[in-house]
Amino acid sequence: MRALGAVVTLLLWGQLFAVDLSNDAMDTADDSCPKPPEIENGYVEHLVRYRCQHYRLRTEGDGVYTLNSEKQWVNTAAGERLPECEAVCGKPKHPVDQVQRIIGGSLDAKGSFPWQAKMVSRHELITGATLISDQWLLTTAKNLFLNHSEDATSKDIAPTLKLYVGKMQPVEIEKVVIHPNRSVVDIGVIKLRQKVPVNERVMPICLPSKDYIAPGRMGYVSGWGRNANFRFTDRLKYVMLPVADQDSCMLHYEGSTVPEKEGSKSSVGVQPILNEHTFCAGMTKYQEDTCYGDAGSAFAIHDLEQDTWYAAGILSFDKSCSVAEYGVYVKVNSFLDWIQETMAKN
């Protein structure tokens, strides 16, 4: 029963430890584990195999360890070094499989967006964040600075945030890191105090190693933002949107290259940050769109060849709400080095 207890404990944290033991190895196990029968002119090896569930086995060998004469578990390639279970990304168990109709979007009842997190800032304002590993999330700098002064520091901001993953599971924030050029780069990362167990409802989305952005390319955006009645929804919603032509988007917003500001010449009254590190996504013919509170959510693109979902963008300008033609997203690929270096340093 001790072996069974190990399986249950590790499975709860997303890791499955499978053990195959026999003969002398059984002497160290519970009597309820039967010894395998012996065979003539042969022998039984004592082996253990490490496996992962919702995780990827990272090891120099094959994860199989043999009990040597010194009663040490060793692998032919890795020696005594144990393998690690690395969180799988971009592989939801129930991906969206059809064009369903975040204004009047569809409810996510299946857990198709396990990377979507809900962030609550000062004065209970709701925004989005995107899980990119089992301990890090991506969001916008504006989200992090909501209801904070311009001279607020990361240490000031972190304690004021509440974060939820999966089925509204609260997680503690250790620190936030904001891009040093946030006036034109609306991006920041959040480190959790502890790693979250990866499962069907909680799974990071993959970071892109290439640029997936091309006009007409379809992506999905999920979020907890305001609905058609301008009320924050208590159910996660999603919508499918096409990447828009950048020139058309810049013309729509008067080609702004500065942070959004009131009283601009834009037809919608505000100008988002638009530059070579951003892209736009337009509304579908059903008039579905993102709205206040959806910022920080991923523009998720499905790579059909790899059957993997990637965060091609992070929603920065979420105030279109079916009024403006386009939402604006930060290209994740443009800041991949900064994101990875920040996680490595911290």
From Swiss-Prot:
GO BP term, pick one: defense response to bacterium
Region (Interaction with CD163): 258-263
Summary of the tissues where the protein is detected: Expressed by the liver and secreted in plasma.
Keyword Nucleotide-binding: no
Sample GO molecular function, one term: antioxidant activity
Highest rank taxon of the organism: Eukaryota
Disulfide pattern: C52-C85, C89-C206, C249-C280, C291-C321
Sushi domain sequence ranges: 31-87
Keywords, comma-separated and alphabetical: Acute phase, Antibiotic, Antimicrobial, Antioxidant, Disulfide bond, Glycoprotein, Hemoglobin-binding, Immunity, Secreted, Serine protease homolog, Signal, Sushi
Record Pfam families: Trypsin
CDD domains named among the record's database cross-references: CCP (cd00033), Tryp_SPc (cd00190)
UniProt-annotated location(s): Secreted
Signal peptide residue numbers: 1-18
Known glycosylation sites: N147, N181
UniProt subunit comment: Tetramer of two alpha and two beta chains; disulfide-linked. The hemoglobin/haptoglobin complex is composed of a haptoglobin dimer bound to two hemoglobin alpha-beta dimers. Interacts with CD163. Interacts with ERGIC3.
Domains as described in the record: The beta chain mediates most of the interactions with both subunits of hemoglobin, while the alpha chain forms the homodimeric interface.
PANTHER family: COMPLEMENT COMPONENT 1, S SUBCOMPONENT-RELATED, HAPTOGLOBIN-RELATED PROTEIN
Its job: As a result of hemolysis, hemoglobin is found to accumulate in the kidney and is secreted in the urine. Haptoglobin captures, and combines with free plasma hemoglobin to allow hepatic recycling of heme iron and to prevent kidney damage. Haptoglobin also acts as an antioxidant, has antibacterial activity and plays a role in modulating many aspects of the acute phase response. Hemoglobin/haptoglobin complexes are rapidly cleared by the macrophage CD163 scavenger receptor expressed on the surface of liver Kupfer cells through an endocytic lysosomal degradation pathway.
Family: Belongs to the peptidase S1 family.
The protein, known as: Haptoglobin
Organism: Mesocricetus auratus (Golden hamster)
Gene that specifies this protein: HP
